[in-house]
Amino acid sequence: MRESDFFTSFSDRNTAALVLALYEADGPLIMKDLQSITNHTQTLRQRLDSMAEEGIVDLDVVFAPHKYVRVSLTEMGKETALLLSMADTVIPGDISDKSINMRYADPILRLMRGKEYVIQKDIKTVMPYYNSITKVLSRMEDEGLVLRTESDEGYREIRYSLTPVGKRIADVFQTIYNKICCKG
């Protein structure tokens, strides 16, 4: 499986928070207004560019009275934001602290979707970033999205399975992924 077939802008950190901030705004926001979410300008611009390529946001460069970038959700972006807001309300706490806003949460949930359990080693074959995936899985476990079990066999095998709430969140991310890949 190629990375481009599996990863989207939602695979990066803070994408969920950016979409929800745009959804909650009364109208288009200026890129500068979103810097409190992703405080590095270049990272924010790259994230917004990838979201624009996927059809989630529109970016308009305005030159009056000075140059700035206006960001707004597309129709598909509004649909994904609605799905994300439902997922956000299921998990308690601020979006900045939630697993769904962390890097690789989206592909991990989609990988686990529809399976009885997934072995940690199998997750690492798709995403070979051990620290990142263990951090996300730990947060998901704390939030009640996944259950962690260790096998009773002779070797240590860490298994993760989705809880009923985790299955609903995974369905949300699968729906968003389908919208992005099929453009609607």
Predicted ranges, named:
Residues 1-18, 82-108:
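Short alpha-helical segments that sit at the start of domains
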Residues 11, 19-26, 39, 85, ...:
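Short, locally clustered residues in the helix-turn-helix/winged-helix DNA-binding domain
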Residues 26-36, 117-126:
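Short acidic, hydrophobic short linear motifs in intrinsically disordered regions
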Residues 36-75:
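General nucleic-acid-binding
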Residues 39-53, 127-143, 148, 157:
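Short amphipathic alpha-helical interaction segments
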Residues 54-69, 143-161:
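Beta-hairpin "wing" of winged helix-turn-helix
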Residues 63-84, 159-173:
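Basic, amphipathic "hinge/linker" alpha-helix immediately C-terminal to the N-terminal HTH DNA-binding motif
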Residues 84-94, 173-184:
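Alpha-helical linker/hinge and terminal dimerization helices associated
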